[in-house]
Amino acid sequence: MRVNGFTKTYDGRKVLDFPGMELESGKIYAVIGANGSGKSTFAKCFAGIIHADKKGTFFDKEYSVGYMPQKSYPFAMSVEKNIALGGTDIVRRDQLMDKLQITHLAKKKANRLSGGETARMALARVFMKSFDVLILDEPTAAMDVELSSISEDLMKEYCKENGCALVLITHSLQQAKRVADEVLFFYKGELKETGAKEQILYAPKEPETKRFLEFYGV
């Protein structure tokens, strides 16, 4: 699927310049870059949460797009009811709660959860529905290593089962190495380099990419 280019400007200053790209169903695209590089702005524009400068459609045709923000604000009802907002398949809901280790929280008010618990609930909710494109913004940032690994396995499973192009915003280069098929590197609001994971993480062409990877120890 073709994603058209777009920009985002705040107070006359361009903070994002995305030239567009092709997304392939069944692949995971990790979006990396330093803080303030435009990763979350890219995710929000792509998901339609904030408006890009250019009016029109992002895709060459109609696709369903899902989005999980970096910080979720659940409704003041039970965890299982929050998850059910994503879909009505009770068996699927229970399977996801079990895998994400939140079954014991099913009846608890979702607005009383910890950050990590809220993130797992939000993941379960978004995984209830099949999307053509799913955008996850730092979904495992509040999780420990074990739960992050479980969540990563679910991302890969969801992507393959649904034929979904999954766009993962992450601050963790190790996570990008583990789950991504392709990597997008943003630098000061620009998509500096994109390609296969092996190319971007181990043989980058752009000097900004090389400096970033050297600094963060890949």
Predicted regions mapped to residue ranges:
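Conserved ABC ATPase signature
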Residues: K109-L113, E117
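C-terminal boundary and immediately downstream tail of ABC-type ATPase nucleotide-binding domains
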Residues: E198-V218
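Conserved catalytic motifs of ABC-family nucleotide-binding domains
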Residues: K71-G87
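Catalytic Walker B motif of ABC-type/P-loop ATPase nucleotide-binding domains
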Residues: L134-D137
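Helix N-cap at the start of a conserved alpha-helix in ABC-type nucleotide-binding domains
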Residues: V145-L147
